[in-house]
Structure formats: structure tokens, C-alpha cells
Curated annotation (Swiss-Prot):
HAMAP family in the cross-refs: DNA_mis_repair (MF_00149)
Protein's recorded name: DNA mismatch repair protein MutL
Any single GO BP term: mismatch repair
Function description: This protein is involved in the repair of mismatches in DNA. It is required for dam-dependent methyl-directed DNA mismatch repair. May act as a 'molecular matchmaker', a protein that promotes the formation of a stable complex between two or more DNA-binding proteins in an ATP-dependent manner without itself being part of a final effector complex.
């Protein structure tokens, strides 16, 4: 067959396949045009999942009469100047949207320019103009109707999913666009039924309150983030670790006001929540980035759902720092049963832990599970696995209010639990509060009793707080181990036989050389030996027996993917969590009131104390009004 030049109509249909692959793609192109036109209100109507009808109306600046036909010419746009791809600030810029839609459907557009006296109308079918410009009826902005989608490309029509599935795609897309463009009012109507209507808002959090997927519950169980570094600003709202979901899909990412999908950003979110939520649960995150246009490429794919960052490491670090700062500053995460929580957690077999890590446990470590919890000495009795036993606590915040007159004393047996619960211990706590002995009530209140030798019951104002003693102490031990690691470094073990490893290329050698000091700080000594060979002489002692070659391979993979040595950090964090689980107070341990209160005070000053190392909540709060509802009291 001889080579022939395809007709413009065929070329447009082929190109349309990349831009318009489903009804949601049509909605995306038209709504993005409305946003770029400065619309304050955008209304979308859909019928039959978008196959029969998609109409988008806005009150934007409109299109001048003499430019309406030009708008349907391929790569004709008012949003980009030749050679200015490095400074894209609009949602659209390729000039393909209207051309692609008109190539595969019947399109009618009515528009009234802000400076014009009247509106004008034009129609296209299958890429061909079917009616010249005629006067139209419209008070302002632009109205576009798309009918019989893919009538000109029957093959594409056969591959559409069910009406319900296509409709859900449209709902999800519009919600993402409405989420980040919170200053614009949005509405979606299917035939005669209004699916949602969002008012223009002044802030992102107010828009999230309107949305069914988030609402007031998320806003109460979320943290605001706002962090800048160089040319990158990270902002948004992230759910508390205890507010998690069983299915993924609630991490929404945006770059310069554009909904995007990025494995880099998803990886940073996953790393930030590592150890704070269970492995089978997923966080709820609304993450937005403002990046200077010169440092991000949005011209990756016609769908504009992917972007490339010039400096991946900087972006990854900015997101990780923003989320990490917010999550760590929220020392004791508030939690109530209204939040979606995880169910169950990983149980660690005792014999397995002892077999794997036993040689790193000192006598003090093994005795930690029965240690006395006193405010002055709690941290010093937590097992030390790295370096010497001295830790500088000059910056610590030991709470000394539970001494002398401020201590709730127990009976002579030193235990308050369900088998011997007495009204005297409860009334004692109340009398202390009534007498005004405490200048300020601590956030987690004061212990009242121990329940089932597993839970601590405390009262703080109108709240009853139930604390899982093992989960809470597990987090305290883990954070203490991290503190020791940061102050004294990680204890290393010298390999009897240094392991020589041949790298794949010079780039890998450069990366290991660049990260050599950081890896040293993490207990891994790697030295170049010439050519493409490195030698591993020392590894973190807590790793035990380790495959050095596999370890180096994983480290290189982590550095190349995320620009950080997070694989080593993650492995250390996992082991520290396992050790903390083994070393913490077990369920069934009877505790004195002063021990319970000591645990509460340390929870208030310890990062991430709202969750154990497996992501389970360490406590729940029940408000008096919630308890009243259980008894149908008004």
C-alpha cells in the first residue's frame, strides 16, 4: 500500500483519541476552559452518563464573535504565546480541547464576550462546521452543548463503560476540580436531579465541609499544612492518622491548581504516614502544591494529568517536611469514635522477636515491661538499644505536677482495676479538681481507674478518656529509642568479612558517594574501592544478619525513586517499632494510679502518641453528650 497523507478530519479524530477517551474527558476540557475564562459559577448538566448530552455553562469573559470559529481550529489558543511553554499558568494551553470534542460529537457553542452587546452561536458535527455564526441568547459567559458523543467514532463508543461507571467518573472529576477551585461555585445535574451544588468559598477547608466525602467530621479530624521551601509551596489539609480508610483513593493531589496523579507525591504521603496507620489502611489527604511554572512541566500528556518536576528531590522533601511537621506537632492526636478507625493490628509472636532481636536486649531492656512508671524516671527506664545509656533531657518536658499533693494515691495494695474498683478513688479525683489544686487541667485529664487490667480510664472536663496502656506505652518506648538514636547515633557492628559489591554503572557509584555521610549517620559504612566496586564494612547492629548486596540495591532504588535514604530509615523504624512492642507494658499488668497518670503526662509530651507503632489509636474520647445519647437523655 502506498504512503498517503491523511485528511485533516481523520487526523483530528486520531488526535481526539488521546484527549477525549470518555465523557469525563469532555467535562474536563470544557470546565477547564470555564476556569481559565475567569468564571465565578460553573453549571454542568449530563444525560445518559454523558453519551446523550453534556452541557457546561459559565459566567466567564466569553469569546468574541470573530474568534468563535477560530477556537475550533487545532492548536489555536489564547492562553499561550509561541515559545512560552516554560511559563504555563492556565489549565489549558494546547488548543486541542474544542477541536477534539467537535471531531467526535455534535457541538453547539453560544458565547457572549464581556465587551459585546449580544451573544453568538456556532455548531459543529464530526469535525465539520454545520452552521455559520448566528445570533444567540445568553446574558453572559459561554454555554457549550455536546450531544451524541463518539457518534463519529463508533469503535470508541463500543468501549465505553456502563452509564453508572461513566457518571461516577464525571462526579469524581468535578469534585476534584471544585475542591481546588474553591472560590468558584459548582453544580452538577443529571437530567433533572441535582447531584451537588457548591457555593463559592473563601478557603479550602470551607469547600471540604460542603463535600460529602469529607464534611464536618474530616475537618474536625484533620490538620492544616502550609510549608514553603525555595520555589515550592505545600498546603492543604491532612487527616489525623486515626482518621483512615480501608480503601485507597482519598489522597487528592494538585499542582498549580491542576488535579494530577503523581507517584512521587503519593510516595511522600505514604512515607509521612509510615508507622502511624496500619498497613492495610489509607490516609485521607488533600495536598496542593504551588510550583513556579519554570520548574514544572505540564506538557507531558494531552490529558494533562501528569507533570514532571525539575527537582524531584526538593518536591519530595517539601511534601515530606510539610506532612511530617504537621503530624509531629500534633503531639497527642485527638480521636473520637466518630472517626473512621482501623480494625485490628499486627500481633508479634514473642518467641519470634526474641529469636531475631534477643541478642540486642540488655537486662534493662527485658525488664522494661515491668518497670515502675514515675514522672521523674520513666524515660530513663525505657530500653536503650543504641550507644550509651545517657540521654540529654535538658530539652525534655518532664511533668512534675504529679508529686506530693498532686498525686492520686491508691490503696495499700497499689492497684485499681475492675475487680477492686472503689468509689473512693473516683471521688478522690473529683475532690482534687473541686478544690482547685491544679492550676490547669492537662489535656488527657487524670486517671480514675484501670479497666480489665488493659485500659486506663481518665476524666478531662466533660470527656471520659479510655487509654490502651500497651499501645500508648509502645509509642513512648519507640519515640524514646528514636531520641536516643538522634542524640547518640546508631550502634554499628563490624562485619567479620567486609563485603565487596560490584555496582551496575557510574551513576550508582556517584549516588552512594553523595549519600555516604548520611548512610554513615544511619550506621552503614560504605566505601568506594575503585572502578564500580564498593565495600560494606559496618551495618546497623540492630539489623542482625544482613544481605549487604540486597541492602545496597534497595538503598539505591530508594534514592533514585525518592531522592532520599528512606529505605534504611524505614527499616530502622520498623525494627524499633517491633522492639518497642516487645518492651512495653503488656495487657494484664495492674498499674497504680500514679503510674497511670505518669503515662498520661508523657503521652501529652510525646510525638505521635495518639497512635501506636502499628497505627492503632492509643486512646478514644467520649464526650458527656455522647454518653447521654446512649441513655437517650436530652
Amino acid at each position: 500500500m502506498p504512503i498517503v497523507v491523511l485528511s485533516a478530519q481523520t487526523i483530528n479524530k486520531i488526535a481526539a483519541g488521546e484527549v477525549i477517551d470518555c465523557p469525563a474527558s469532555v467535562v474536563k476540557e470544557l470546565v477547564e476552559n470555564s476556569i481559565d475564562a475567569g468564571a465565578k459559577t460553573i453549571n454542568v448538566h449530563v444525560d445518559k452518563g454523558g453519551r446523550n448530552l453534556i452541557s457546561v455553562s459559565d459566567d466567564g469573559c466569553g469569546i468574541a464573535c470573530e474568534e468563535m470559529e477560530k477556537a475550533f481550529i487545532g492548536h489555536a489558543t489564547s492562553k499561550l504565546i509561541d515559545g512560552d511553554l516554560a511559563n504555563v499558568k492556565t489549565m489549558g494551553f494546547r488548543g486541542e480541547g474544542l477541536t477534539a470534542v467537535a471531531s467526535v460529537a455534535r457541538v453547539k457553542m453560544v458565547s457572549k464576550h464581556v465587551d459585546a452587546e449580544r451573544a453568538w452561536s456556532i455548531t459543529f458535527e464530526g469535525g465539520e462546521k454545520t452552521r455559520d455564526l448566528t445570533p444567540g441568547v445568553l446574558s453572559c459567559g459561554t454555554h457549550v452543548e455536546v450531544r451524541d458523543l463518539f457518534f463519529a467514532t463508533p469503535t470508541r463508543l463500543k468501549f465505553l463503560r456502563t452509564e453508572k461507571a461513566e457518571m461516577q467518573n464525571i462526579v469524581d472529576l468535578l469534585n476534584r476540580l471544585a475542591m481546588i477551585n474553591y472560590t468558584i461555585a459548582f453544580s452538577l445535574t443529571i437530567v433533572e436531579r441535582q447531584i451537588f451544588k457548591y457555593s463559592a468559598q473563601e478557603s479550602l477547608i470551607e469547600r471540604l465541609k460542603e463535600m460529602r466525602a469529607f464534611g464536618e467530621v474530616f475537618c474536625e479530624q484533620s490538620l492544616e499544612i502550609n510549608h514553603s521551601i525555595d520555589h515550592v509551596r505545600v498546603y492543604g489539609h491532612i487527616g489525623l492518622p486515626t482518621f483512615n480508610k480501608s480503601k485507597p483513593g482519598m489522597v487528592h493531589t494538585f499542582v498549580n491548581g491542576r488535579p494530577i496523579y503523581s507517584t512521587l507525591l503519593l510516595g511522600a504521603v505514604k512515607s509521612a504516614y509510615h508507622g502511624l496507620i496500619p498497613k492495610d489502611r489509607h490516609p485521607v489527604v488533600v495536598l496542593a502544591l504551588d510550583v513556579m511554572p519554570a520548574y514544572v512541566d505540564v506538557n507531558v500528556h494531552p490529558s494533562k494529568m501528569e507533570v514532571r518536576f525539575q527537582d524531584k528531590r526538593l518536591v519530595y522533601k517539601a511534601v515530606l517536611d510539610a506532612l511530617g511537621e504537621a503530624l509531629s506537632s500534633n503531639v497527642y492526636a485527638r480521636f473520637s469514635p466518630a472517626a473512621t478507625t482501623s480494625e485490628g493490628h499486627d500481633h508479634f509472636a514473642m518467641d519470634s522477636i526474641e529469636k531475631t532481636y534477643g541478642k540486642f536486649f540488655s537486662e534493662d531492656t527485658e525488664a522494661a515491661s515491668t518497670m515502675q512508671l514515675q514522672p521523674e524516671v520513666l524515660n530513663h527506664n525505657i530500653p536503650l538499644l543504641f550507644g550509651s545509656s545517657h540521654v540529654d533531657d535538658s530539652k525534655g518536658t518532664h511533668d512534675t505536677r504529679f508529686c506530693a499533693d498532686h498525686t492520686h494515691h491508691n490503696d495499700t495494695k497499689g492497684s485499681v482495676h475492675t475487680k477492686s474498683f472503689s468509689a473512693r478513688s473516683s471521688s478522690s479525683a473529683e475532690s482534687k479538681m473541686e478544690q482547685g489544686c491544679m492550676l490547669e487541667e492537662p489535656p488527657l485529664g487524670y486517671a480514675v481507674c484501670q479497666l480489665f487490667e488493659r485500659y486506663i480510664i481518665s476524666r478531662a472536663g466533660d470527656y471520659v478518656i479510655i487509654v490502651d496502656q500497651h499501645a500508648a506505652h509502645e509509642r513512648l518506648v519507640c519515640e524514646y529509642i528514636k531520641k536516643v538514636t538522634e542524640q547518640e547515633g546508631i550502634k554499628r557492628q563490624v562485619l567479620l568479612m567486609p563485603e565487596f559489591i560490584e555496582l551496575g554503572n557510574e551513576y550508582e557509584l556517584e549516588l552512594l558517594t553523595e549519600y555516604r555521610e548520611k548512610l554513615r549517620d544511619l550506621g552503614l559504612i560504605v566505601e568506594p574501592m575503585g572502578d564500580l566496586t564498593v565495600v560494606v564494612r559496618e551495618v546497623p547492629a540492630i539489623f542482625g544478619v544482613v544481605d549487604a548486596k540486597a541492602l545496597i540495591s534497595k538503598i539505591l532504588e530508594s534514592i533514585m525513586a525518592k531522592g532520599d535514604e528512606l529505605f534504611v530509615k524505614g527499616k530502622l523504624s520498623h525494627i524499633c517499632g517491633t522492639v518497642a512492642c516487645y518492651s512495653s507494658i503488656r495487657s494484664g499488668r495492674i498499674m497504680k494510679l500514679e503510674e497511670m497518670n505518669s503515662l498520661l503526662r508523657h503521652m501529652e509530651s510525646t510525638p505521635h502518641s495518639g497512635q501506636c507503632n502499628h497505627g492503632r489509636p492509643t486512646y478514644v474520647k467520649l464526650k458527656l453528650s455522647e454518653i447521654d445519647k446512649l441513655f437517650e437523655r436530652t
